[in-house]
UniProtKB/Swiss-Prot annotation:
This is Protein NrdI. Pfam families: Flavodoxin_NdrI (PF07972). GO terms for molecular function: FMN binding. Probably involved in ribonucleotide reductase function. Belongs to the NrdI family. Gene3D superfamilies: 3.40.50.360. One of its GO terms (biological process) is protein modification process. SUPFAM superfamilies: Flavoproteins (SSF52218).
Length: 144
């Protein structure tokens, strides 16, 4: 099972993913970096940006541009099987909003959300759920 993730310079999402102890690869932070191409099913883990905009509904851009660029590649998008989102509960209704957006656009299940870098329970629940449901989610690596 592969975890593809995006993390800002705060590295909150990076720390969460490392605690999952699953094979992972990071989407490049800088748009000038070589784009990531994946060739196997994966779960996407990403942070949510722009908290609090649901009050006005304006300028809502919860999905990081690096993730948008990654998913705009049809090849990459064809391998997404589930999404996990991080965020800040101070965002209120927008907490984990990136997961909702990606789930709807890519037609994959939004399986978990965690706050900041996640706690021990988040890691246990998320990892356990992914491992236990890998076959059901289509996250097992396909034979070539």
């Amino acid at each position: 099972m592969l975890v593809v993730y995006s993390s800002s310079v705060t590295d909150n999402t990076h720390r969460f993913v490392q605690k999952l102890d699953l094979p992972n690869v990071r989407i490049p932070l800088r748009l000038k970096d070589e784009p990531l191409i994946v060739n196997e099913p994966y779960v996407l883990v990403c942070p949510t940006y722009g908290g609090g905009v649901s009050l006005t509904g304006e300028n809502s851009r919860p999905v990081p541009r690096q993730v948008i660029r990654f998913l705009n590649n049809e090849h990459n998008r064809s391998f997404i099987r589930a999404v996990v989102a991080g965020g800040n509960s101070n965002f209120g209704a927008d907490f984990g909003k990136a997961g909702e957006v990606i789930s709807a656009k890519c037609k994959v299940p939004y399986v978990y959300r965690f706050e900041m870098m996640g706690n021990e329970d988040d890691v246990r629940i998320c990892r356990g759920g992914l491992v236990q449901n890998a076959a059901k989610l289509g996250l097992e690596k396909q034979a070539s």
